[in-house]
Amino acid sequence: MDRYDFPDAQGHFGPYGGVYVAETLMVALDQLKEEYARVKADPTFWQEFHHELKHYVGRPSPVYHAKRWSEQLGGAQIWFKREDLNHTGAHKINNAIGQALLARRMGKKRVIAETGAGQHGVATATVAARYGMECVVYMGAEDVKRQSPNVFRMKLLGATVVPVESGSKTLKDALNEAMRDWVTNVDSTFYILGTAAGPHPYPMLVRDFVSVIGAESKIQMPEAIGRQPDVVVACVGGGSNAIGMFHPYIEVPGVRMVGVEAGGHGVASGKHAAPISSGAPVGVLHGSKSYLMQDADGQIVETHSVSAGLDYPGVGPEHCHLKDIGRAEYVSIDDDEALRAFHDCCHLEGIIPALESSHALAWAAKVAPSMGKDQVILVNLSGRGDKDINTVAGLAGITL
């Protein structure tokens, strides 16, 4: 393909992305854009970033051959990129460290974040403790109930957790509240956005920080199997773990990229969180233009997923663009399929995956039998499932 060079100076990925925010936030975003442009060209910043990833996060995360599961499926070989092994248990820490270092450079003493599953909240609270910053995390009240272990973790790490009671009480509402806080406290506060969405420059800088995932696997897979995988696959909510896996492969011919959205109770039911694969129209949410789940009047519709981290009505603008140009494809996996993959991964590989990651695992398990035994699917195992055991137990009628 032609050289891939996105976003443009205005933060557009084709027709998606951009900056659709209140005037009060423009100054903060311009400031962030200028600082990030400086940082991007500064090798000392990246040296510090990679030093932290190695010595604090424990990178590089390994690639792992899921042999027993692959054998049982009888087709393609399934490999995992083990982001679950990072400090704090998910890919979120890569982005949180990058943004916290940026905040420190900008002299900000207070950081805020939104969180769904709680993983980004934990990652933000972690880096705030690491760098001595005040931390406030906004979390939908519904998610606070679903993810009580992560709420307690954030508090242990010194963060203030604010339950958001408005709207559907999930991730989008937490994001709204975080943006309100930022508008009010823009001079002292840095907003550590948790996914590759939101207004420019967030989709770009988040992507740059999480691209370490695909950059590593691009080196690791040839060492492990002598070549690149046939398919790379990742779950997509806002889309940060997926863009971190995909971006380094965009210009690599022959590597298929598949993003797996949350099919909830099935796309036909309307109770899902799959804006791209369900053919949702384009709209603006949280400062950015993307495919967006909305009704005929343009009102955001309530989403559903068994996984709190995928329960979001929009998606990062770069994914919309990759879909439109045909470089990546997007599919959905429903709650039941994801839960089945969750249990299979536990039983066959001794790894408890996050429910988010289980969507990507389920798609891999679904297609592997129809592929050749010499073909390879690399799944971004974006996080571990300790945080989800209450949810999974509850669905099985078990009280912990």
Swiss-Prot record:
Catalytic activity: (1S,2R)-1-C-(indol-3-yl)glycerol 3-phosphate + L-serine = D-glyceraldehyde 3-phosphate + L-tryptophan + H2O
Signal peptide (UniProt feature, chain positions): none
Function: The beta subunit is responsible for the synthesis of L-tryptophan from indole and L-serine.
Domain of life: Bacteria
Cofactor: pyridoxal 5'-phosphate
EC number: 4.2.1.20
Pathway: Amino-acid biosynthesis; L-tryptophan biosynthesis; L-tryptophan from chorismate: step 5/5
A molecular function GO annotation: tryptophan synthase activity
Complex formation: Tetramer of two alpha and two beta chains.
NCBIfam families: trpB
GO CC list: cytoplasm
Residues with the N6-(pyridoxal phosphate)lysine modification: 92
Stored SUPFAM superfamilies: Tryptophan synthase beta subunit-like PLP-dependent enzymes
Organism lineage: Bacteria, Pseudomonadati, Pseudomonadota, Betaproteobacteria, Neisseriales
Protein name: Tryptophan synthase beta chain
Keyword Amino-acid biosynthesis part of the UniProt annotation: yes
InterPro entries hit by this protein: Trp_synth_b_CS, Trp_synth_beta, Trp_synth_beta/beta-like, TrpB-like_PALP, TrpB-like_PALP_sf
Protein keywords: Amino-acid biosynthesis, Aromatic amino acid biosynthesis, Lyase, Pyridoxal phosphate, Tryptophan biosynthesis
Pfam families referenced in this protein's UniProt entry, alphabetically: PALP (PF00291)
Record family assignment: Belongs to the TrpB family.
Source species: Chromobacterium violaceum (strain ATCC 12472 / DSM 30191 / JCM 1249 / CCUG 213 / NBRC 12614 / NCIMB 9131 / NCTC 9757 / MK)
